[in-house]
A protein has these predicted regions:
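Short, low-complexity N-terminal intrinsically disordered segments enriched in polar/charged residues
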Residues: 1-35, 39-59
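Surface-exposed, charged secondary-structure patches
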Residues: 2-17, 53-55, 59-133
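Short, surface-exposed loop/turn motifs at beta-strand boundaries within globular domains
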Residues: 22-24, 34, 99-102, 137
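Low-complexity, intrinsically disordered terminal/linker segments enriched in charged
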Residues: 110-176
Length: 176
């Protein structure tokens, strides 16, 4: 995967950073998905992704969008589990079941730009070691955007960067 460069030279690959907040954010997100903690999943999502999920919920539930918007991250909002369920189901299905989510390794972060980074989800390949690209294919990518001083999972960037990298989108099976 390469990043776009405004100059005439060839695109440069993203910078790899081995200790980056997205690694912990990815682990936190996958754990929340594995244990079906809707509030924790919601807290890990970007504003745009939350809006997309609220819109998806509104369409499925046949309610006005303004009634679906503003889902509270606390367990007190009954809509939260319904809004997050399609995303969770998509991830669990794409990654082989809730019980396998803890087996994925998290790569060093790839920094696309100041506000975008991604990590690769590496399948369980045994003991900790440096792996080659062939060892982790097929893998998945999880993209983050930096907003409100946090790195948050972003559905749109994950889809876009997954396609660019030729990887399956772990969030892409969300359907009506």
């Amino acid at each position: 995967m390469t990043t776009k460069n405004s100059g005439a030279s060839a695109p440069r690959p993203p910078k790899v950073q081995f200790e980056h907040p997205t690694q912990l954010a990815a682990t936190t997100f996958l754990r929340a998905v594995a244990v079906d903690d809707a509030a924790a999943i919601w807290e890990c999502l970007s504003r745009e992704t939350r809006g997309l999920l609220e819109g998806h919920y509104a369409a499925r539930a046949a309610v006005a969008l303004h009634r679906a918007a503003g889902v509270a991250p606390s367990g007190e909002d009954a809509r939260l589990a319904l809004v997050v369920a399609p995303l969770r189901d998509s991830i669990v299905g794409a990654l082989g079941g809730a019980e396998t989510l803890g087996g994925f390794g998290i790569s060093g972060a790839r920094i696309v730009d100041r506000a975008t980074a991604y990590v690769l989800l590496l399948p369980d390949f045994g003991e900790e070691r440096i792996v080659t690209e062939i060892d982790w294919r097929p893998s998945h990518l999880l993209a983050f955007v930096h907003e409100s001083r946090e790195w948050l999972v972003d559905l749109g960037r994950t889809a876009e960067l997954s396609v660019d990298a030729g990887l399956p989108d772990p969030l892409g099976a969300i359907r009506r």
